[in-house]
């Protein structure tokens, strides 16, 4: 039986999926750049302790702001 996810884990997963969905709204030739950036950003904090709630909440706020920025149609590429 799979382990149930906590509220923060669900929020992180939602942020990741929303980020990938946003990346797929960009031009085909630049989507890989966005997806690579997302993987790098999430990978940086992969080993963050699950009990470090304040850091996780801060990173969620920062991530949501980045999604809002990346969702603008004027932004077509990221390096």
UniProtKB/Swiss-Prot annotation:
Q: Which residues cross the membrane?
A: none
Key words, A-Z? Chaperone, Mitochondrion
**InterPro entries per the UniProt record, alphabetical:** Complex1_LYR_dom (IPR008011), Complex1_LYR_SDHAF1_LYRM8 (IPR045295)
Q: What outcome is recorded for mutants in which this gene has been deleted?
A: OXPHOS incompetent because of a profound and specific reduction of complex II activity.
An additional note in the Swiss-Prot or TrEMBL entry is:
Present with 861 molecules/cell in log phase SD medium.
Keyword hit for Secreted: no
A Pfam family of the record is Complex1_LYR
Name of protein: Succinate dehydrogenase assembly factor 1, mitochondrial
Query: What's its job?
Result: Plays an essential role in the assembly of succinate dehydrogenase (SDH), an enzyme complex (also referred to as respiratory complex II) that is a component of both the tricarboxylic acid (TCA) cycle and the mitochondrial electron transport chain, and which couples the oxidation of succinate to fumarate with the reduction of ubiquinone (coenzyme Q) to ubiquinol. Promotes maturation of the iron-sulfur protein subunit SDH2 of the SDH catalytic dimer, protecting it from the deleterious effects of oxidants. Acts together with SDHAF3 (SDH7).
Its subunit composition reads: Interacts with SDH2 within an SDH1-SDH2 subcomplex.
Originating organism: Saccharomyces cerevisiae (strain ATCC 204508 / S288c) (Baker's yeast)
Main localization (coarse): mitochondrion
Its gene name is SDH6
> Where in or outside the cell?
Mitochondrion matrix
Name a single GO biological process. mitochondrial respiratory chain complex II assembly
Q: Please report which protein family the annotation says this sequence is part of.
A: Belongs to the complex I LYR family. SDHAF1 subfamily.
* Key word Chaperone present: yes
Any GO CC annotation of this UniProt entry: mitochondrial matrix
* SS bond list: none
